[in-house]
């Protein structure tokens, strides 16, 4: 399984829209910075046709160190959650059924 990188996204922008490399890289960085910044500020990020990024509060809980078996406390924290939108789910399903 391959992974799409930010560099590859920028290269696709260069190919499809004829952007300069610097502009394409800056565009990609700014796009992801907007998502990061919004999440840091507690905002949900909704990308129509793609999905939603939101924050979920996780409570503190007891845990166990898998190497030593020692009981440890896992502190409360905020985690980022992504929920794929309907259109994205349909396209992924369609692509997987064709392969």
Swiss-Prot record:
**Which keywords annotate this record?**
DNA recombination, DNA-binding, Transcription, Transcription regulation, Translation regulation
**Key word Transcription present in the record?**
yes
At the top level, the lineage of the source is Bacteria
Cross-referenced InterPro entries: Hist_DNA-bd, Histone-like_DNA-bd_CS, IHF-like_DNA-bd_dom_sf, IHF_alpha
> Which spans are transmembrane here?
none
Transcription regulation as UniProt keyword: yes
Gene Ontology BP terms: DNA recombination; positive regulation of metabolic process; regulation of DNA-templated transcription; regulation of translation
GO terms, molecular function: DNA binding; structural constituent of chromatin
Q: Which GO terms describe its cellular component?
A: cytosol
Any Pfam family the entry gives = Bac_DNA_binding
HAMAP family per UniProt: IHF_alpha
The function of this protein is: This protein is one of the two subunits of integration host factor, a specific DNA-binding protein that functions in genetic recombination as well as in transcriptional and translational control.
User: What's the family?
Assistant: Belongs to the bacterial histone-like protein family.
The entry describes its oligomerization and partners as: Heterodimer of an alpha and a beta chain.
Would you tell me the protein name for this molecule? Answer: Integration host factor subunit alpha
Q: Which organism is it from?
A: Mannheimia haemolytica
